[in-house]
């Protein structure tokens, strides 16, 4: 029995800007939430102010395009929308003011 391929996340960050810790934190957040549903979370060093996140090759966050860095909950929602759209992310899906 062959299982479906697991998602690959790549976080490309600017080494000149020293964004490795931010990229690592985002990777940790995704791994904590999705665990074994992810096949890989890669940190990819880059330059020139880059901070991009892809899921299975699809660009889901780009710092310049999207106006800065993602909040963890937004990034989790975008990954979820690709790998498991029916999944409830619990508190990460609730808006401010929604009942708990």
Where are the predicted features?
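Local sequence-structure signature of Cys/Sec-based thiol-disulfide redox active-site neighborhoods
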Residues: 1-34
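Eukaryote-biased feature marking scaffold/signaling PDZ-domain proteins and nuclear chromatin regulators
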Residues: 4-6, 46-48, 70
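Eukaryotic short linear interaction motifs
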Residues: 18-19, 51-52, 61
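Amphipathic, hydrophobic secondary-structure cores in small proteins
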Residues: 36-52
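Non-catalytic, surface beta->alpha helical segment in thiol-disulfide oxidoreductase systems
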Residues: 59-87
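C-terminal helix/juxtamembrane-tail motif
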Residues: 85-100
């Amino acid at each position: 029995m062959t299982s479906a391929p697991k998602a690959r996340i790549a976080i490309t960050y600017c080494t000149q800007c020293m964004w490795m810790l931010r990229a690592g934190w985002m990777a940790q957040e995704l791994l904590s939430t999705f665990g074994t549903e992810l096949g890989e979370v890669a940190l990819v060093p880059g330059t020139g102010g880059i901070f991009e996140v892809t899921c299975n090759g699809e660009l889901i966050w780009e710092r310049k395009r999207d106006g800065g860095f993602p909040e963890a909950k937004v990034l989790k929602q975008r990954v979820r929308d690709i790998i498991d759209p029916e999944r409830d992310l619990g508190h990460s899906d609730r808006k401010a003011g929604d009942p708990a």
